[in-house]
Structures are given as C-alpha cells and as structure tokens.
Amino acid sequence: MNNYIVRVNVGWVLVFHLTVCCLGTTWAADSAFPESQNVFPDTTVAWINIADPDAFSKSFDRTQYGKLIRDPHMEAFVKSFREQLSKAGKQRLGKLGLTIEDLGQVPGGEIAIAAIVPEAGRLATVLLVDTTGHEEETKQLLDEIETRLVEQKAERLADYEKKIRVYRLPQESPSADNKDAAEPQEQVVAVVHEGKALVVGDDPVQVSHVLAVLENGREDCLASTEQFKNVSKGALKNLGPENSKLRWYIDPFAFAAAYKSAHPANKRQKGPDYVEILGRQGFDAVKAMGGAIVFDAGPFQMRHQTIVYAPPLPGRDPLSVDRYDLAARMLRFPESEEIQPFDWVPSGVSSWSSLKWDIQTAFQSAESLVDDVVGEKGVFDDVIASLKEDPDGPQIDVEADLVACLGKKITLIGDFEEPIDVDSDRLVIAIEAIDPEKVAATVGKSMATD
C-alpha cells in the first residue's frame, strides 16, 4: 500500500462538519437494521454512510476546526455556509421531496445512501435512515414529502406492493431552441417507513428489495464483494471502533457507465468521452476506491484514509511496469514510509501535499493516451520529435534532457497573499530534480524560443 501525507484544506473540513451538524439529533444505542453495506446489493456502485453522526459531530467539535467555527468572528461565515448548504440540498434532494433540514428530524442511527445498478443502463438511488426513537416525526415527514411533491405537480400512483408510496414527477419539457436535447426520462419517487427504517429512492423495486432484507441483511450484499472487502481493509486500517467515521466507496467505471446511460447527453455533444478513453487505455484496472474520515484521532485533528483498489491484470507481476495495459502503466507510485517537505518550504504555508510517482514510466506510457484523446495516432511522437528536430523550436530531447533528470517526489504547496481577497490564493507545484543543472538548462533553452 502506498502511503501519502496530505494536509487537508480547512474548507473541506467545514463541509463535512456543517453537513453533519444539519443531522444533529438524539441517537439510539441499538441499530434498527444490519449495517447498510450488508443491506444494499452487490450491484451497488457507490455508497456513503455515517453509522453514528452524533459521535462523528462531537469528535469534530473537539478539534481546532470545531473551535474555529464556534468563534464569534466566524458566525457570519457559518450562517452563510449553512444557507448555501441548504440551497444545494434542495437542488439535489428536492426531487425526492426532501430537504437537508428533514434529515435532522428523523434519524436515530445510521444514515446511508447508495447508487445501485439493477441492470445494464439503469442507475437507482436509495436513501436508508434508522429512525429509532423518531417514528412520529417520520410519519409527519411522509406527509410533508407528499405535500411538496404535489406542489411540484407530481402524480401519486398506486402504492407498490400496497405499502410503498410512489409518485411520478412531471417531465421537464426540452427547450424549443435546443433541438439536440436528450429525450426526457420518467422520474419517480418511492417512499416507505416501516418499523424503524425510512427508505426513499427513485426506483420502487430497489426500495422494496432493501425493505425486504432489513431484518437480517442479504448474502449477495455490497460487503460480500471482493472490491469492497479490499477497500474496507485498507481504509479502516489502524482505525479502532472507538473512532466514529464517515465512510465512502465507489466503483468509478461502473458508476460512470450507469450514470451516462441514465443521463443521456445532448444528441450532438462534441468532444472526447474521457471515461471511455480511460477505459480503453487500461485505467479500468481501477476496480474500486473508498475511504474513511475521522476527527480527533489521537495526534491527528483529522485523518482521511483513502484506498484505490487496482489489482494487477491476471498473470502479471504485481511489481512489474507491465502489471497494467497501455497508458495505465503510468499508475506507479513507489512505496515510502514517510515523505518530508523540501527544506525550502516555509513553515507558514496554508497547505502542503506530497506523493511519489514514477515520472519516467509515466512519460513512456503517455503516447497512446495522448493519441486517443486527440483522435489521431502518432500525434504524441510527432510533438516530441518536433521539439527536438524543428530548427525553429527549442531543439530539446524531452525524455533525455528533462524527464530523465527528474526524481519521483512531487509536492503541491498552497499559500495566500495579504490582504485577503478573492485572488489571494497561490499555488506552487514542485518536482524533485536529480540533475538540477541540466533541468535548469533545458527549461532555459525552451523559454528562450518562446
């Protein structure tokens, strides 16, 4: 496993906490159903959960970040951010008849959301909430959901399996000026509250399937898949059960393919399809990604462990450059016990991130990717050759005079200028040089012809 040291931008930390704060309520000690990864099916391609949001929020409050947002000087910012978060929630949850504020009224335990691919070309979303201790509030919420959907001119259909409320949303008419717009897709909302669980989704069949296995879970669940097991093993390493976590998981190529089918683009959309290109270039070797976020974890204010699960192709040496095909061979990140900042990095910078990357292999693997993006074979070689041979160009051998002189350490440094303004941010990208004199000469030669 590759180890990276990352300083996280405070803005993202605030996003996590203020989102969870919207869920603040009283939490039950006992779960109403098995952990959601044992409830959602093995066709789940994306998943987010917080098993104990109350403990998660409290752990944040104990950090310096928590103290920062409680500072009176931050009051206006926090208020504005909450309003923006609420507005964003309305845009995303509105079609399900929900708001961010609703999610603060009913949870008594875990909150989880999953993207499921029931069959090729379809993508279903299901929200699962443990409502233990909040059954009455949940019943009221169901009535509020119906009122909101009716206001959106949704049509209530016959209950699915006599217990799941189903609403058909009105289709958005394409603009008369946009003849290339994709055909509008039928959208429905399915809602059910049974026992101590609230299940909301855009596919009544998938909502029914989740409801049916809430007592004992299912054998063919997300947690049973090889990808999820490997991601979880790495993401949870050295994180004890005492740490309340936000966890996430995604099968990036399966999710992208399903999303693309479920949300067709304009008929004449121009430009390359980068997801298809990456798949053709071998990057579909990345089977899954996931992680866990904890606050107040020992010496760390915030700890985020992210895992990319990309096993070598069958029969390939895991340590070989050729463990993947084509451009995906550039996915080589050497092991490192730790990565320390360069000596010249100031102590007062606002952020610092660093990793190790085999730049030489990446360069040698880039040809097919560049050609695929451009749509013409030989483009990459032509550009490299022209930089070396064109009498009006810099006449540099990119691989020998530059790439071969670079090390494997890459660093991103964030800082700001005062007084603080909208354009105060500064960013430096630094790459280790093992032959700095030759690198300087090559860069100087290239700039001289610019």
Question: Which ranges hold each PLM region?
Answer:
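N-terminal secretory signal peptides that target proteins for export/translocation
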Residues: M1-G11
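Bacterial N-terminal signal peptides
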Residues: G11-T25
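Structural boundary/hinge residues at secondary-structure and domain interfaces
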Residues: A28-P184, E226-A288, F295, I307-D423, ...
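Short, solvent-exposed coil/turn segments at beta-strand boundaries
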Residues: P41, G133, V192-L198, Q301, ...
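Helix N-cap motif at beta-to-alpha junctions
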Residues: T131-E135, D202-V207, A433-P436
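A short alpha->loop->secondary-structure connector
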Residues: I145-E151, V207, L211-T225
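Hydrophobic or amphipathic alpha-helical targeting/insertion segments
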Residues: Q187-G201, V205-V210
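C-terminal substrate/ligand-recognition segments
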Residues: D425, I429-T442
